[in-house]
Amino acid sequence: MAEAYPGGAHAALASRRSSFRNSLRRLRPTEKPDTSFMRGVWKYEIFPSYVRVTNKQVLQLDAQCQELPPCPSVGQILSFKLPSFSFNTTTYGSRYFTVAFLFFGAEDNEVFLKPFFVMHSDQDIVLSVLNPRSLFIEKGKFTWYIVPIRLVKNPYLYLQILPGQSDIQLTRSCTQSGDKLNTSEPQIFLSGSPVTSQDECLPYLLAQHTPPFLKSYARIHTFPGKVCPVNAIRRGKGYVRVSVDTPDLKREGPLNVKVGMTLLDDVIIAFRYNPYPKSHWRWDGESTDIRYFGSPVIIPPNFITELEYNNTYEAPLSSKITAVVVSHSSNPVFYVYPQEWKPGQTLKLTVRNISNNPITIVTGQSMAQAFFIYAGDPSISTIMRRYIQRQGCALTLPGNIVVESSSLPTFERINKTFNGNIVASEGTL
């Protein structure tokens, strides 16, 4: 099990805040690229912390064309400025943060470029459009960007400990044992048969409210490739209720469910509910699946509908963390439009059936991916918007998230850090 986020996490986030405040003092007129070149139909302009790409020729599209003309890999593009550029999200960064490259189109493009993240410099690039149609795009009228984004790592399942919704008479509890009880991260293990009640849609384990449950968060002991039975944790006066949901709950006869957790005071991101209902926990730390939970929904061909996603998350150590939700780029059946997922808020997913057949969305189905990003101070977004057209020093990411370009990590810094010329630290990502 990983360590909890100690004081180092606070120091890392404090460094981010200082860096972002300093960047606001450097608002400058329209930026000029460090390097520009042409390859195929595209003109590439490389700035210190992003790449702007425009069509240097007329683009002729048709209704069967779902891909734009090809482009080189990130490594090949940036080699025009940094000949030895190389990068891999998995091995870059620190315990808390890493960086990935976000590809997305400008808001005023005539066709919508599906946004996606690139995790290493040699990755093949496929530029896919939504709802292709026959049209000519004039020279210089289609723009897209490559932007390095700080991602917040989330490789473990952290849940909030929620307040109990009703009073419960604790006449019988499950077995409870503990370990490391005299440390700041006590571990609790529950074992017993789930019970049901009218006010809970899921069965649950009922346990005594022992001192470790005074903490605010729990890291659930789960494993990659396994279905985690824990859905949510609630505490009330004298009791703790752990909602559980596994395929085994449907079988007849007594069932014993075992749950382990580490109780914590500080985390970077914690969910209200397990974001992986009835599905395997994906242990990569770079994104979190958005999985549907609810009654089945049928979407006719080429229709758009809205689906409620009632999960929320907290980012207690920083107000600068938000999430951008993007559809799976390889999904041939439906598309989820990108949007921002703010802490403490639920989502309304706008889902489009892009197939020729009706589709049914069921509980546990993966809809999209949430990438948690360090986007800077949310209170200054309105100010930034005023500079987008006038000074050209801010970028609007998918989901209408505005970032100031000088607050982004630079390509030079990424290259030096990854190749060992700079020792990675929380303040240099």
From Swiss-Prot:
State any GO BP term from the record.
symbiont-mediated suppression of host innate immune response
Q: Which residues form the signal peptide?
A: none
Query: Which InterPro entries does the record cross-reference, listed alphabetically?
Result: Herpes_Orf11
Keywords for this protein: Host-virus interaction, Inhibition of host innate immune response by virus, Interferon antiviral system evasion, Viral immunoevasion
Q: Name one Pfam family in it.
A: Herpes_ORF11
Is Transport there in the keyword field?
no
Family affiliation: Belongs to the epstein-barr virus LF2 family.
Q: How does it assemble?
A: Interacts with host IRF7; this interaction inhibits IRF7 dimerization, thereby altering its function in immunity. Interacts with BRLF1.
- Name of the featured protein: Protein LF2
- Organism source for this protein? Epstein-Barr virus (strain B95-8)
